[in-house]
Amino acid sequence: MKVMKFGGTSVGSVNSILSVKRIVESASAGEPVIVVVSALGGITDKLINTSKMAATGDSAYEGEFREIVYRHVEMIKEVVPAGEGQVALQRQIGELLNELKDIFQGIYLIKDLSPKTSDTIVSYGERLSSIIVAELIKDAKWFDSRTFIKTEKKHNKHTIDADLTNKLVKETFSSIPKVALVPGFISSDKTTGEVTNLGRGGSDYTAAIIAAALNADSLEIWTDVDGFMTADPRVISTAYTISELSYVEATELCNFGAKVVYPPTIYPVYHKNIPIIIKNTFNPDGVGTVIKQEVSNPHSKAIKGISSINDTSLITVQGLGMVGVIGVNYRIFKALAKNGISVFLVSQASSENSTSIGVRNADADLACEVLNEEFAKEIEMGEISPILAERNLATVAIVGENMKHTPGIAGKLFGTLGRNGINVIACAQGASETNISFVVDSKSLRKSLNVIHDSFFLSEYQVLNLFICGIGTVGGSLVAVSYTHLTLPTIR
């Protein structure tokens, strides 16, 4: 048995959703499959925007809602054959859309949008799409993920209750049909039963939770790319698909900006040693990327991929009053954690007089506020400088488990950056040597990615196109020297 997850782009158009039908029906011919689907491409954003418009009293929300209705109604007409099945599906989808219409109207009238109502609204995206796909695929049976994906509230956030969820998943799928169809992303509170969700990208997480609970043979994530790439192909034209990654490498790449897999997805299947296979719905015969415990070629390239986070702010806590003082870093990270601020990079001077942390731009102001409050006494006494954020930065990470076996990687990396005039503002490397990350000015990001990719992934030999105008003393000597170094074919 395997679990297959299809993202929004995979169910976003008539052609793509028909491709999903072919892929699933082919897979289910040999074994039972559980299929997890996202909302139709772009619908989640449209639901959120429509909610916000209604909450501000903007009557144009009605036009946005009509577009949501149109997308689903037209999809049914295009992919489901005319007849009783189509009529029944239109009725079922119509009921859900009417519920959604009433919710939007209520928000518009009271001009208020609570988090609970927002969670309810975005759940309709996956509920609508999964019901349509279930009708489209032969022998598919629909299951409501709200009945078995359970969350609890911790630190004002909804998190999975793993024990209860695993128990309910096993009970729900004690007998697996040929095709089980499940809406991704959505869940419910274990105490109140209220609709919750697993966050953007949560459909990947839904699929991983189910795969782990049922000890699936594999988890397939079908998306609109061929797998993990050596770098962002939109920036690096020579980037290519990585055939294999370890769980650790995939996690590092995801944490530093690669959006192929939602980061929390990896742990549940890693714990059960279930391989994750990334495939392209639009190129189903492509090789894709396999994520597993151990790669089959341990002597492959030292680094597997390059990832980046463009919206970086660097916050530095510094001052001579920090030197030799125990607990400064503890206070930094405790204050940030208490306010829900995630830190993805830490760099500390060996003299202990400064610690720099990388956060998302959206968290920078709050991070400065809470740290200035935490160290208010030290700042007033001049022991620590006022804490400010350095903005318009980008973080780049090179990732690969083989780096720990290869000397000179850091030297090659920073040498490449230096030769190309790129200034490194901060850097960090864990003791595991799986990741080297550094911060640069955001204007240097594209150049950084290109020169690093050329250095680590292209041929050891660079091709130079040399043009000589005239063969005088200098030109003639250059031609003669070049000729003596040519490797000529052997003539038999």
Task: Label every model-predicted segment.
Residues 285-480:
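A conserved regulatory-domain signal marking ACT and ACT-like small-molecule sensing domains
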